Curated annotation (Swiss-Prot):
Gene3D superfamilies: Glutamate Dehydrogenase, chain A, domain 3 (1.10.285.10), Leucine Dehydrogenase, chain A, domain 1 (3.40.50.10860), NAD(P)-binding Rossmann-like Domain (3.40.50.720). Pfam families: ELFV_dehydrog, ELFV_dehydrog_N. Coiled coil: none annotated. The active site is at K124 (proton donor). Catalyzes the reversible oxidative deamination of glutamate to alpha-ketoglutarate and ammonia. NADP(+) binds at T207, N238. One of its GO terms (biological process) is glutamate biosynthetic process. Belongs to the Glu/Leu/Phe/Val dehydrogenases family. The gene is gdhA. GO terms for molecular function: glutamate dehydrogenase (NADP+) activity. This is NADP-specific glutamate dehydrogenase. It catalyses: L-glutamate + NADP(+) + H2O = 2-oxoglutarate + NH4(+) + NADPH + H(+). The keyword NADP applies. Keywords: NADP, Oxidoreductase.
Length: 448
């Protein structure tokens, strides 16, 4: 009854925040076995407190475009929970950004950061600004205007933002530069920085590498591996590119990539150098890959199956959704399973619909939910914070080894929790309960 009461209250209070509802529903319904066995969480109103952000900040961002016209966007930062450490989570610049999207991401971040073993609370922020089609100077002016409002709410031990969709190293650089001018301090207030001013080696690789490490841990328990296996990857940003890179390093065969216009299937395996050239150097579209590689086929989004994504209709052993939320529908899940897919590891945040997740759990495949499988990115952000605090940078090998260790620990924690609650293949339950228990314990200890 406790969970049902919370969900009804949430629906009544925020009727139009569907992404936030989806994230909360997925998380707290899997907490039922814990909540039924321990009534102290209800006594301390932990769910009520957990789903309500500690602070929501919304602000106007005014900036000048290249024609000297004033443009107005909306910025926000949702500081969700700081029970186990300073707020930590990315900034997203995309037209789809609204309160519901940022709250869903912030809520997910709380549980994800709890799993990392590091002292980080959860937050998320961003703007409906679209960097696509903007000049370098326009992006710089927007970032500076955005930081003019945000700077008073963040700090190295208060709230440490990072990048997300639309916010890469370039944008972080402009944001950091403006923060430094405003406060006259050089401190680790942002992660994802360039290597010349406090960034960490292995940061851009971290989410993709970590996702593959987590998938390997899941498969190892079943006496299997990714070596020699065909893998489907969606997206073509940092997460997808470095998922593909790590898959190639361990001898797997990734055959797909995508962007908002369509997807490519390369039967010979993805040419990583060409993909990086198109996406990281030219900032081009994925269809350019098919124009240059005869072994590749391009499918535009208008030719995708109705209610589905063509990436997931390519037969594969393992799937790595690495683009955006709700990119993998129930139709896609059925297709993956009927084509013999044995492993799904989520590089993106909430890429699978709740119905799709239900099918994966029912089929008892190796399913790594995003808050566990993609926690490598924020883990290395935490390691970047540690390097900034000590003023001592670490080598790529040291950071990668620490990342690998963290992903192993996350898997161990999630797997042991699932076994504790008599559902050993349910890593959704394992991840949510493991993440929740740590945060809830800290909240109870700190009082109301």
């Amino acid at each position: 009854m406790y969970v049902e009461k919370i969900l009804q209250s949430l629906q009544k209070k925020y009727p139009y925040q569907k992404e936030f509802h989806q994230a909360v529903y997925e998380a707290i319904t899997s907490l039922k076995p814990l909540l039924d066995s321990d009534k102290s969480y209800e006594k301390h109103a932990i769910l009520e407190r957990l789903i309500e952000p500690e602070r929501e900040i919304f602000f106007r961002v005014c900036w000048l475009d290249d024609n000297n016209q004033i443009q107005v966007n909306r910025g926000c930062r949702v500081e969700f929970n700081s029970a186990i450490g300073p707020y930590k989570g990315g900034l997203r610049f995309h037209p789809s950004v609204n309160e519901s999207v940022i709250k869903f991401l912030g809520f997910e971040q709380v549980l994800k950061n709890s799993l990392t073993t590091l002292a980080m609370g959860g937050a998320k922020g961003g703007s409906d600004f679209d960097p696509k089609g903007k000049s370098e100077h326009e992006i710089m002016r927007f970032c500076q205007a955005f930081m003019n409002e945000l700077y008073r709410h963040i700090g190295a031990t208060t709230d440490v933002p990072a990048g997300d969709i639309g916010v890469g190293e370039r944008e972080i650089g402009y944001l950091f530069g403006q923060y430094k001018k405003l406060v006259n301090r050089f401190e680790g207030v942002l992660t994802g920085k360039g290597l010349t001013y406090g960034g960490s080696l292995c940061r851009k690789e971290a989410t993709g590498y970590g996702c593959v490490y987590f998938a390997e841990e899941m498969l190892q328990e079943r006496n299997s591996s990714l070596e020699g296996k065909v893998c489907s990857v969606s997206g073509s940003g940092n997460v997808a590119i470095y998922t593909i890179e790590k898959l190639l390093q361990i001898g797997a065969k990734p055959v797909t990539a995508s962007d908002s216009n369509g997807m490519i299937y390369d039967k010979d395996g993805i040419d990583l150098e060409l993909l990086k050239e198109i996406k990281e150097v030219r900032r081009g579209r994925i269809k350019e890959y098919a124009l240059e590689k005869k072994s590749a086929e391009y499918t535009p989004t208008e030719n995708y199956p109705k209610g589905g994504n063509a990436v997931w209709h390519v037969p594969c052993f393992a799937a790595f959704p690495s683009a955006t939320e709700n990119e993998l529908s129930v139709l896609d899940a059925k297709t993956l399973l009927s084509n013999g897919c044995k492993c799904v590891a989520e590089g993106a945040n909430m890429p699978s619909s709740n119905e799709a997740i239900g099918l994966f759990l029912q089929a008892k495949i190796s399913y790594g939910i995003g808050k566990a499988a993609n926690a490598g990115g924020v883990s290395v952000s935490g390691l970047e914070m540690a390097q900034n605090a000590s003023m001592h940078p670490w080598s790529f090998e040291v950071v990668d080894a620490k990342l690998h260790h963290i992903m192993k620990e996350i898997y161990k924690n999630v797997s042991q929790t699932a076994k504790e609650f008599k559902d050993p293949t349910n890593f959704v339950l394992g991840a949510n309960i493991a993440g929740f228990r740590k945060v809830a314990s800290a909240m109870i200890a700190q009082g109301v």
